[in-house]
Amino acid sequence: MTTAPQPKQSIFSPELVRGAVRASFAKLSPRDQARNPVMFVVYLGTALTAYLTVANLVTGKPWGYELAITLLLLLTVLFANFAEGMAEARGKAQAASLRSAREDVKARRLVNGQEELVAGTALERGDLVVVEAGEMIPADGEIVEGLASVDESAITGESAPVIREAGTDHSGVTGGTKVLSDRIVIQITSGAGESFLDRMIALVEGASRQKTPNEIALSILLSGLTLIFLLAVVTLYPFTVYAGAPASAVTLIALLVCLIPTTIGGLLPAIGIAGMDRALQANVIAKSGKAVEVAGDVDVLLLDKTGTITIGNRMATKFHPLPGVTEAELAKAALLSSLADPTPEGKSIVALARQLGVDAPEPAGAEFIEFTAQTRMSGVDFPGTSIRKGAGSRISALAQERGGQLPPELAAITDEVSRQGATPLTVIENDRLLGVVALSDIIKPGIRERFEQLRRMGLRTVMITGDNPLTAEAIAKEAGVDGFLAEATPEDKMEMIKQEQASGKLVAMMGDGTNDAPALAQADVGLAMNSGTQAAKEAGNMVDLDSDPTKLLEVVEIGKGLLITRGALTTFSIANDVAKYFAILPALFVTAYPQLGVLNVMGLHSPTSAVLSAVIFNALIIPVLIPLALRGVPYQPMSAGALLNRNLLVYGGGGILVPFIAIKLIDLLIGGLMS
């Protein structure tokens, strides 16, 4: 992973804290508070205790206790606002850095073959723009002519330039990046304010962040618990009246605030925002919080072999001619079919042929046939000759269509190359099969261990490749994936995704080409490469700025971290209520029912100190947990059952133990001050 586009700041850096403090007070409006039902109850309780404090002050009654509770409840609300403000401030800092990458540059627009200088903001979809070395790319687009080295560090943080080329899956360019060499013609794909950078800034700022389905479900649960505790507290008041020691309204409000799940209620918005923030720290732009959340629930990962499982630099390593064909004949035919092939594989075939002393000029009247995922072959036609190279099954079918024979040795050569983990490309000239070109790749170091981790997480990995089944099987075994789809076409990918989804599975995949767009849109998590085509980036619900195919594995871990953090803090928050129950409930009834003093297991000094201690802890635990909410609970690959048991022990047990200790310490401090 590369460095993020902005300098990483510590969680509590002065700039972020100042912004979060301002946001804490700005969010005190009823409209903002009403978005969070749990904290809205605390907000209303604060207003009511403030009213009772003023009423006591005016009528000459004691008001110190009421004022203390009011200030503590206000702090609880402010701390919850501060948590959300911290998460938002981090996003705004990142957005400011991204915005600095956007410059209003001049563009050289092509009109009827003539260049005219216009403002970058005046460009519209479909315009053709010329960009040369040293110039900024004015807007998002697709290269339609040429090849260039592009500096994308303003977007990705990666200082190494990348190659962008017309007619490939790496033809997409982003406004705000800089051309370092050569000349390209770009067709603009976004209007003013609609560029990828503009959308990134809007997403990072989170101005229109929507709650995710799990977040909504949890909010409903927390609201239900709040309603139950509200009814319970209201019911307690008649009991205290009947006992002859009516509880004050302020104490009942304090009890309610301590019992409702204010900890998770105050941290929930921050956890959701922080999930998208952690994705951005990994240089992944998530188009919604839902995309990050769903990544944590994914069951099946569809992974492209090239670039994800292997290094992705397949090179021609050997020519295997059939009987009756010389190596030079095979090399020449393969070279001719690859002269216009822009792929690394095609260029390596030309290089290998020339190493063997075989060379040939481009034939007169040559028409080059590009490779497509549907045909799975490429080649060249010129007068009297038609040469194709491609997948063995497709070339064999072509040979039969042309009336040629299938030499029995072909299958043996193909199988041997495949068993070695190389990709066999079969070459045919007219109706005569010439032999096989072996393309070799290398399994990425450590990838097998990574897949083992995913298996322990309960995920199934499927390798997608255009290779024949034997090659696919050899690589799948070496890499340790759970399954593979060989000789895959875009339609095959789509069909597999639909089948998995029909069986109730959530599917994640990555892609970079226009032909990947339908599958990216169909997948529950579609990670598009920033270097890919505009269609792929539009179809996916995440974009990887580093264009690293292995990033899909990291995205899944980020999603799981988000879900685990939310679950762990919810468990901790609800477990807190047990300790606060033992602190406040005896304080309510001990005067009327002295025998209830046995419930005062913490040995708190007095009813007043008990209530104050619980409310102080209830307020302070929110800022204490902010770093955990923003960083996330560390995720370790393990089964769902083991993960649940660990979280119940750590966060459930800790949620009971920590308040017992903290409330007792606060009570000792209050008792010392009061004495």
From Swiss-Prot:
Q: Which PANTHER family match?
A: POTASSIUM-TRANSPORTING ATPASE ATP-BINDING SUBUNIT
Q: For ATP, which residues are the binding ones?
A: D341, E345, F371, T372, A373, Q374, T375, R376, M377, S378, K389
Q: What functional role does this protein have?
A: Part of the high-affinity ATP-driven potassium transport (or Kdp) system, which catalyzes the hydrolysis of ATP coupled with the electrogenic transport of potassium into the cytoplasm. This subunit is responsible for energy coupling to the transport system and for the release of the potassium ions to the cytoplasm.
The cellular location(s) given in this protein's UniProt record come to: Cell membrane
**Residues the record lists as binding Mg(2+):** D512, D516
Active site per the UniProt annotation: D304
Q: What is this protein called?
A: Potassium-transporting ATPase ATP-binding subunit
Query: How the protein sits in the membrane?
Result: Multi-pass membrane protein
GO molecular function list: ATP binding; ATP hydrolysis activity; magnesium ion binding; P-type potassium transmembrane transporter activity
InterPro entries given in the database record: ATPase_P-typ_cyto_dom_N, ATPase_P-typ_P_site, ATPase_P-typ_TM_dom_sf, ATPase_P-typ_transduc_dom_A_sf, HAD-like_sf, HAD_sf, P-type_ATPase_bsu_IA, P_typ_ATPase
Give the species this sequence originates from: Deinococcus radiodurans (strain ATCC 13939 / DSM 20539 / JCM 16871 / CCUG 27074 / LMG 4051 / NBRC 15346 / NCIMB 9279 / VKM B-1422 / R1)
Keywords in UniProt for this one? Answer: ATP-binding, Cell membrane, Ion transport, Magnesium, Membrane, Metal-binding, Nucleotide-binding, Phosphoprotein, Plasmid, Potassium, Potassium transport, Translocase, Transmembrane, Transmembrane helix, Transport
Q: Which SUPFAM superfamilies does the record cross-reference, listed alphabetically?
A: Calcium ATPase, transduction domain A, Calcium ATPase, transmembrane domain M, HAD-like
Gene behind the chain = kdpB
